[in-house]
Amino acid sequence: MRFNQYSYINFPKENVLSELKKCGFDLQNTANHKDSLETFLRRFFFTYQDTNYPLSILAADKKTDLLTFFQSEDELTADIFYTVAFQLLGFSYLVDFEDSDVFRKETGFPIIYGDLIENLYQLLNTRTKKGNTLIDQLVSDGLIPEDNDYHYFNGKSLATFSNQDVIREVVYVESRVDTDQKGLSDLVKVSIIRPRFDGKIPAIMTASPYHQGTNDKASDKALYKMEGELEVKLPHKIELEKPQLNLVQPQGKAELIAEAEEKLTHINSSYTLNDYFLPRGFANLYVSGVGTKDSTGFMTNGDYQQIEAYKNVIDWLNGRCRAFTDHTRQRQVKADWSNGKVATTGLSYLGTMSNGLATTGVDGLEVIIAEAGISSWYNYYRENGLVTSPGGYPGEDFDSLAELTYSRNLLAGDYIRGNEAHQADLEKVKAQLDRKTGDYNQFWHDRNYLLNAHKVKAEVVFTHGSQDWNVKPLHVYQMFHALPTHINKHLFFHNGAHVYMNNWQSIDFRESINALLTKKLLGQETDFQLPTVIWQDNTAPQTWLSLDNFGGQENCETFSLGQEEQAIQNQYPDKDFERYGKTYQTFNTELYQGKANQITINLPVTKDLHLNGRAQLNLRIKSSTNKGLLSAQLLEFGQKKYLQPYPAILSARTIDNGRYHMLENLCELPFRPEAQRVVTKGYLNLQNRNDLLLVEDITADEWMDVQFELQPTIYKLKEGDTLRLVLYTTDFEITIRDNTDYHLTVDLAQSMLTLPC
């Protein structure tokens, strides 16, 4: 384990003493260090009647137990302090470590022995081997009462609200959209779990079209075969209009009553970060949105109608929209428990909705935590003039997603009444998708949140993985740079795939978010500020560094690609084409081994480099015909240890999100030997070689100069490493699978790779 502590806040000594005293650690500034440590430990072991016993089973050094040490005349030393501290954090002395000073350096332990009271205060705010901070572990065990009131420690809310006796209710928010054109505003179901409290509390809201269930069967039927010819497009300039949103006004009157009438029973799934915040005094709201089970309207996936309906839930929390008790719209209930302040959470589609919500500039949305979210839907299902698939999901497109998330069809009555209209709406969507050309058009323009990024007022926290080929890193990169300069923005850029990171051992992500939300939603005045970029170092396990920016580098490193012309044959023998189509993983493996139709260029790294931003290929290229698809991947090549893209379980169900509440696994990205690691990749239709909105002819056998930017990333390379650039046509995981007989030729002498460093 390595410690990477971003959540700790330096407080004045008087605050430290006051907070310790409130938790029963009655330490005196004038006492000697040894006496203070004993006083601290006897309170620490509050679950024991006889505190001599737990002291006797800890060690001060290799020859002395802690009780014997306190009974001796020996002085407290730095070595003894560290030895005791590591044991309190769950490490076994003489098993996990023998020399505390060596272990301190190996783990990056954040505490330097000096002022013992401040050392002990920081120790309580340090994560244990099992994933909780020490203070959270003690509170979970009953250190302070579960009194349904707020208690703070180091600028973070503690788990002092009951998660057993909570209010569970359902309301139906009246949106300002009418997606199915029935003349009534769509209703959106809101599932609420909130702690009991006499005052007003903030809300953690997860906007998830998946939450009420998914129609996997219908979605699978809607998948496309990726086999087909790359379209030869007519040259033209793509014209667009400013997206419009038509809102509807509330209709009719409704009796105001005191409480919701529908009780929330079981929910499909909760998000463990939300579980963590519930006993800390934050309401949990789950909203599936229009076109989902128990709500009304069509599934408009990603457009501002869908976003508006989610926004209206925040409006209700602030008294600007109504919520009914049921679908009759006869009785309404106010969110009189809400303080109006909201943070959004969730990954993938959930993080996408956070991005969209932020761009409305809605009052009350204080923080978004957008994890692996889409910023422009075109870049999810298309790329540079190509029809593409999200990584791992060949054949998926917008209409199959619509079938997946239109969960109203899971209710037989809704299916009978509404499926015909839903299918008619879906046909309109299919016509607008334009799978023929893969070009950007008005449909995608209406689902581009970057256009409204200037409206964002909330503080923004992103998480994204360098190995996320589902929602590719371009999404967070573009959103990060589109945000107004005056707002606070932060990015956790890890080396995983499309995964959550809130339960990783190596970083105090949950505690950092706690510090942020306690400040922004609960009004605690602290100096807490996350770095702009927190990056997981790819060269070592469990190592995180603070950076000033994602991209924006002034210096570049250029690699020449060769001295000759090389060709990429597009067509495969039928046997290989069929084999790759059945299992794209086989294609990826053989591509990395140099066995596919490809140009492979190994580039020695002659000095340490820190890539930060978008690698760019400048290529002199020609096609043997009037079309061309170019794929590129940049690998770090060579057998060595690399971080793996998916977290592994270190310890099952050891993280306590409250008090014996929603225990979850402690995880981390493994660091294992592999033959290579993907650094970045990209795909380009050569007819869109100069601009996404400009379609140009390709003249057979005529040279073209192409500037091709790959996916943004942050990656460290060391002198002696090897980069492998792979150029090819069809990618059997991502692109259309065109097996026509043509080839691309690259003049390597007139081509180069540029890395921003």
From Swiss-Prot:
PANTHER family: COCE_NOND FAMILY, PUTATIVE (AFU_ORTHOLOGUE AFUA_7G00600)-RELATED, PEPTIDASE S9 PROLYL OLIGOPEPTIDASE. GO terms for molecular function: aminopeptidase activity; dipeptidyl-peptidase activity; serine-type peptidase activity. One of its GO terms (biological process) is proteolysis. Its main location: cytoplasm. Keywords: Aminopeptidase, Cytoplasm, Hydrolase, Protease, Serine protease. The active site is at residues 348, 468, 498. GO terms for cellular component: cytoplasm. It comes from the Bacteria. Belongs to the peptidase S15 family. It is found in: Cytoplasm. It catalyses: Hydrolyzes Xaa-Pro-|- bonds to release unblocked, N-terminal dipeptides from substrates including Ala-Pro-|-p-nitroanilide and (sequentially) Tyr-Pro-|-Phe-Pro-|-Gly-Pro-|-Ile. It comes from Streptococcus pneumoniae serotype 2 (strain D39 / NCTC 7466). Its EC number is 3.4.14.11. Removes N-terminal dipeptides sequentially from polypeptides having unsubstituted N-termini provided that the penultimate residue is proline. Homodimer. This is Xaa-Pro dipeptidyl-peptidase. Coiled coil: none annotated. InterPro entries: AB_hydrolase_fold, Galactose-bd-like_sf, Pept_S15_Xpro, PepX_N_dom, PepX_N_dom_sf, Xaa-Pro-like_dom, Xaa-Pro_dipept_C, Xaa-Pro_dipeptidyl-ppase/CocE.
